[in-house]
Amino acid sequence: MSAKIKSGDDVIVLTGKDKGKIGKVIKVIARDAKKKVIVSGVNVHKRHTKPKAGSSGGILNKELAIDISNVATLDPKYKTPTRVGFKVIDGRKVRFAKVSGEVID
């Protein structure tokens, strides 16, 4: 089965403290029924690390995963949230934005 959101997609956050932020999907985590995504610049937390051999330690900013239902793919033409559909073009199954009909990949 094809995924509606993939790594590298531009998405907008629909709910939560980062509502309205736009970012690129870094990673899709699909474990069991809980699908999550890591989006650049969204849900950033500070991680305190101790110094070890080879690294100095300190405070690092790290993006944490958010639920896939809290993001929507951006339409490539209008830059608005859109649902994703599938259609076959020249024997290839492709994703398209339902708002504008533009092919996403």
UniProtKB/Swiss-Prot annotation:
One of its GO terms (cellular component) is ribosome. It holds the Pfam family ribosomal_L24. One of its GO terms (molecular function) is rRNA binding. One of its GO terms (biological process) is translation. Keywords: Ribonucleoprotein, Ribosomal protein, RNA-binding, rRNA-binding. SMART domains: KOW. Part of the 50S ribosomal subunit. PANTHER family: MITOCHONDRIAL RIBOSOMAL PROTEIN L24. NCBIfam families: rplX_bact. One of two assembly initiator proteins, it binds directly to the 5'-end of the 23S rRNA, where it nucleates assembly of the 50S subunit. One of the proteins that surrounds the polypeptide exit tunnel on the outside of the subunit. Belongs to the universal ribosomal protein uL24 family. This is Large ribosomal subunit protein uL24. It comes from Wolbachia sp. subsp. Drosophila simulans (strain wRi). The gene is rplX.
